[in-house]
Amino acid sequence: MNIHIEGNIGAGKSTLLNFIKENIECSISQEPVDEWEKINLLDNFYKDISRWSFTFQMNCFISRTQKVDNLPEGVNIIERSIMSDRIFAKNCYKNDQMTKIEYDIYLKWSKWLYEKLSKKIKNIIYLRSTPQVSYERIKMRNRNGESDIPLEYLEQIHKLHDEWLLDNDDINILVIDADNLIYDKDIIDVIKTKFCLLNKNDSINIDYHF
């Protein structure tokens, strides 16, 4: 089973990923940010989105697909999916930061690949943080390449995530309030229950309010 963690930049995806790893028997797959940083692609993208949008989004899509294609058997918790890459590409196009030709090429490539991998994207945890909280967290963590991300950009990405995930009946989705998330046994119980990961030794409490 594959479970993808989706959410805005700064929503807390990596933190939740590692917390799940400590409490549920699973394999984890983190977003390959370090690969993008090695070639300075993340920093270049946020400094000049129009120039680097197509290059960055194609690279993200390819590197993420390679990871998904090599997942082990069992339960896999994966930071983002190929579908969230399409959100960022769509936002670039809507803001005239990606040309129509570039966007059409991206969609053609992503559609073909998505059809091959869509069966693997059936379970999603949506960490839903408000744009302001995401913005503050980004400033606090001070990750290389993210210092130029404006609040307006996070608001746009937040809106697209909501449009995709809040009323999507095709995917098994757990929506979590990421602004006030407490990392404790309760949230693990909710995740186990939602995605049928319980075993006979589990004693659970699912009276959890998001």
What are these regions (language model features)?
Residues I5:
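Hydrophobic anchor at the beta1->P-loop junction of P-loop NTPases
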Residues N8:
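P-loop (Walker A) phosphate-binding loop of NTP-binding proteins
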Residues K13:
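Conserved lysine of the Walker
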Residues L16-L17:
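Post-Walker A alpha-helix
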Residues E22-S63:
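Conserved substrate/cofactor phosphate-moiety recognition/catalytic segment
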Residues S63-I101, I125:
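A basic- and aromatic-enriched beta-loop-alpha substructure that forms the phosphate/nucleotide-
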Residues F88-K159:
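A glycine- and Lys/Arg-enriched "phosphate-lid" helix/loop adjacent to the NTP-binding pocket
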Residues Y135-F210:
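NTP-dependent small-molecule kinase module
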